[in-house]
Every structure is written in C-alpha cells, then in structure tokens.
C-alpha cells in the first residue's frame, strides 16, 4: 500500500517526523517564480519577488539549511537539509530522506524500514517544508500579514481548484526584512493542526555529487526493504 505523505502531517511527524517532513522539497516544485499580484505588499521596503528569486538561485547552486520543527503536543526537533534543484537530502531524528530527482528513499529507524517510491508532487511537498517557499506563486493568493519588527510575513492561500498542498489550509513564510532570507515557515492544516519550521542557518552546500542523494548499502542493510516503485 502506498504511504499517505500528505494530510494530517502532524500525526506522522510526531516521534521522528514520521509524517515525513515539509519542505520539504519538496520540492522544488517550482522552476520559476511567477508571482501573483500581492495584496498589501510594501514594495518600497520589501520585494517578495526578489526574495523568492534569491532563494531559488541559492537552491539551484546547492544550499544547506538547519532548522527546528515544532508541532502541537510534541517536543521541538532539530533537522538538517540540503537542496539542489529538485533534489534534496533531509535528516531528522530517527529518519533520513533522499530524493535524486526520480526516486524517493526513506530510512525510518523507528519502524526499521527502508522505503523506495516514485513520488507524486504532493508526496514531495509533504516531505520538505522549504518546498513551500518555492511553490509557483500563481497558484496562491498572497497577502502580507502583521509582523514583528525587522521581519515581513506573507500568507499563501491556495486558489480555488488547486490541490498542491493536500490537507493544508494555508501557509505563512516569515522573511528577514534586511537580508530577505526566509526565517520561518508555518503550515496551517484543515483539521486545525499547525507545524512550524524555524530556519537557523542557510549557507552554500559544496561538493555535491549524484551520490549525495542516495544511501550506501551499509546504511540500510539491516532494515526491511519496502519497494513501492
């Protein structure tokens, strides 16, 4: 049976991000940022288009990100991911995820499984939070929200007829006003749950090869292999 990587994301992220993260990549559902008209954007102070384009360029070259995942009723979890175009590697306590552009590989230590699958775009979106930053903005109604000093917050609400974020009512991205870098991603689910990713560091990821997005046999040799391709 194909695992459900969307909907009630929080239930699966609890112990070890079982729900298999957002981002993340995600990912990389977007190759270009076609920005829809923004409601209430302070263009003279902050340019959302430039902020998104800057992040996209970082991802194209390879970027490493450390973050903290928090959700209701669970302890905060530290995570690490690096993104390279559509490909990504994600590390959380008890779980490792890799996507090489075609095959999604998941090591789940709590269930002692190594899963391989050909993911849908929704599967990828459910895996990596930072993917939401890269979503094609034409699919969303974007509004600026009230924000703490030194930051800018935008809410992204899927337009009618789109189903990119299955189970997600809307999400918000907080940017640093000076550096224009994303600082936080908050996902608000239809059932009332909220999952937040606080980004601590974004830096270039060097020495990326094709082997960066897969696992060596010794990493999963003691696990049950579940091949869903």
Model-found features: residue ranges?
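N-terminal secretory signal peptides that target proteins for export/translocation
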Residues: 1-18
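Bacterial N-terminal signal peptides
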Residues: 23-34
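N-terminal leader/targeting segments and the immediate start of mature chains
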Residues: 32, 36-75, 86, 218-229
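Non-transmembrane domains of secretory- and envelope-associated proteins
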Residues: 41-42, 148, 159-170, 177-229
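Short, hydrophobic/aromatic-rich segments at coil-to-beta transitions
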Residues: 60-66, 84-90, 149-157, 179-186
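Beta-turn initiation residues at beta-strand->coil junctions
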Residues: 69-71, 92-93, 108-109, 186-189
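An acidic-aromatic
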Residues: 78-127, 195
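Flexible, surface-exposed loop/linker segments and immediately adjacent secondary-structure boundaries
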Residues: 119-150
């Amino acid at each position: 049976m194909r695992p459900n990587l969307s909907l009630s994301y929080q239930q699966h992220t609890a112990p070890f991000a079982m729900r298999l993260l957002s981002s993340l990549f995600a990912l990389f559902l977007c190759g270009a940022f076609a920005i829809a008209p923004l409601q209430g954007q302070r263009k003279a102070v902050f340019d959302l288009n430039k902020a998104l384009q800057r992040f996209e360029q970082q991802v194209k070259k390879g970027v490493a990100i450390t973050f903290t995942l928090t959700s209701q009723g669970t302890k905060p979890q530290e995570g690490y991911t690096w993104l390279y175009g559509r490909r990504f590697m994600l590390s959380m306590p008890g779980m490792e995820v890799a996507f090489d552009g075609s095959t999604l590989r998941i090591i789940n230590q709590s269930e002692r499984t190594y899963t391989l699958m050909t993911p849908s775009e929704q599967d990828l979106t459910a895996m990596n939070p930072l993917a939401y930053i890269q979503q094609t903005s034409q699919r969303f109604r974007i509004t600026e929200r009230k924000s703490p000093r030194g930051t800018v917050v935008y809410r992204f609400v899927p337009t009618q007829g789109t189903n990119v974020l299955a189970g997600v009512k809307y999400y918000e991205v907080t940017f640093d006003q000076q550096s224009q870098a994303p600082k936080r991603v908050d996902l608000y689910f239809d059932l009332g749950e909220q999952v937040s990713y606080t980004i601590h560091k974004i830096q270039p990821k060097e020495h990326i090869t094709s082997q960066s997005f897969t696992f060596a046999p010794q990493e999963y040799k003691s696990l049950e292999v579940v091949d869903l391709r």
